[in-house]
Amino acid sequence: MLSRESPFTRRGAVSPNLLFMPSSHTSIDEDAKGTTKHSETAPIDGKKEDDQNVMIGAVGATWKEKLTVVLTTLFLTFGANYTLAALPVLKPMILKNTYYRGHLIDNAKYGVMTSASNLINTVLPFFSGVLVDVYGPSYIALFCSTCIAVGNLVLSLGASRGEFNMINGGEILMGIGNVTIHMCQLKIYAHWFRGSTVDGPGLLGLVTGFDVAIGRVFGLMGALIPAPLMEATGKWYWGLWLGFIFSIFAWALCLVYVLHERTLPAPRKIAQSMLHRRCMSPWQHVTAFLGQFWDHVVQVPAAFWILILVQLLQTGAVASYESNTVDMMVVTRGEDNVASLKSAAYKYSMHYAIPIVLTPIVGLGFDKLGYRNAAISVCACFYIVAMSLMGFSQVHPVVPMLFDAFGYTLNSVPFLATVPLLVRRQTLMGSAHGILKAFNASGETIMQVAGGSLQDRAVRHGKPMREKYDYMLYLVLTFKGLEALYGGLYHALDRRYFGGVMRMTEKQRVKKEAELGEQSYGSLCRPHAFWTVLGCVTSVLIVAAAYGVFIHFWITNPDEKPGTA
């Protein structure tokens, strides 16, 4: 259990947590008949007796309640995931039909476009993660669903009119909701499906894997639908309008979950840190929130900071490759026509189809077998083979796409399944996922824009079109080569400093948690000033770099032969 005192709190100073001391606390009393009775207030961060409750989650929840949660929560990212998957498929058409200041856009501008939804998420998740912890995920998710729907509308209008700036504006609006709503999902899953000493081993790994798998289904739809729809209607942008319709459906499901949660008894509801402060003035809310934000940041364990610092730019390397895969197949193995685009899109669908089945199995495997650290190196090796075969050989694209699908299956699940183990307090879960999302968004922005710029540079240096991806591939392969070595690094860290939590099965973890009580798994599973400062400084630097790269390539006119690079 993490220390309640921040490493930055001065002796005798008042901790920001004291600003949020609840007027009443959740308690469990035994009545004369031996039944369990809960108070009317949900668990709130503040007292020592609350700590166990905020780590347990929805104790005694029925499977009917859990099924309702799953069916409404899984679809919250429907519209966003579909649209993000459709953009890479439509890259050849985007380059031919989208204008900036009267010029067709180039590959660097396309990189700006695909990373626009990430731009706001270089900063927003730091705060939205705390917002999810402070106010609960349901209403935050409803706001995010609204942003996604409006963003999809603006993006579709921009595509219809061929306006680069309008498409970017829609992407940014969609980005405001996309990452934050996923944090809301993860917070909800951790509350309802995390194992405890009361209910026994949970199914968090399985549910997390199933969430990732259903996201792959939405991505599969985004990969398969746009090309046939374009062929049937003669309009390349109709696939994006379908994403707007899906986002409206997701918004309606989010509203259903909010209404469902209001019917639950207080002990079933997710812990909120400011439940009793709803009547504060706006300024008091701001100052209290900033205090809570800082308190959450400094209580994040060192192991979590180490995890995201080591993985810096790795997600961006994958995003840079994936956003260009369809165009890479067309350029290196096909012709510049709708038939080649349609064929490439079908092959690209393997990227989503295979993980639909395998991802839940991987998540369940982590619950039953452990060894999340080993999956990181295996994932990197799959990507190295996929990228090398796709970019530097003429083998049938199905072969590299098969390796790509296996890599994509393992890409995020080990980290999503590990974060709740390193960050044991429920009221810090949103903050931790927010920091992780912000780091990933910054890395994706930098790497996607850099990848597009390297493609344009290759063309300007006289490389033939079929070799325009060489420079970008050299960059991303370097990062994946490093990641292949990280499994051994994580094994050593986990064994010595993390208490073996990455290698444990869910059953072993619950048993050890019962033995440790409030003690930490390992020496780095609690806050350390050095790692907190290093993480915060790195956050500022990578966010500044992301904004600098993005703005520079947004306002720069396309070079030489726009749209043909």
Task: For each feature predicted by the language model, list its residue ranges.
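Cytosolic juxtamembrane N-terminal segment immediately preceding the first transmembrane helix
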Residues: 2-82, 86-87, 525-526
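Extracytoplasmic
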Residues: 68-100, 321-326, 416
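Extracytoplasmic gate region of multi-pass secondary transporters
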Residues: 87-88, 301-360, 447-448, 543-552
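Conserved MFS/SLC helix-loop-helix module at the cytosolic interface between two early adjacent transmembrane helices
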Residues: 123-164
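Helix-to-loop junctions at the C-terminal end of transmembrane segments
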Residues: 123-137, 357-371, 455
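Cytoplasmic helix-loop-helix junction between adjacent transmembrane helices
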Residues: 170-213
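Symmetry-related core transmembrane helices of the 12-TM Major Facilitator Superfamily/SLC fold
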Residues: 238-256, 470-490, 534-544
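C-terminal transmembrane helical hairpin of 12-TM major facilitator-type secondary transporters
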Residues: 370-415
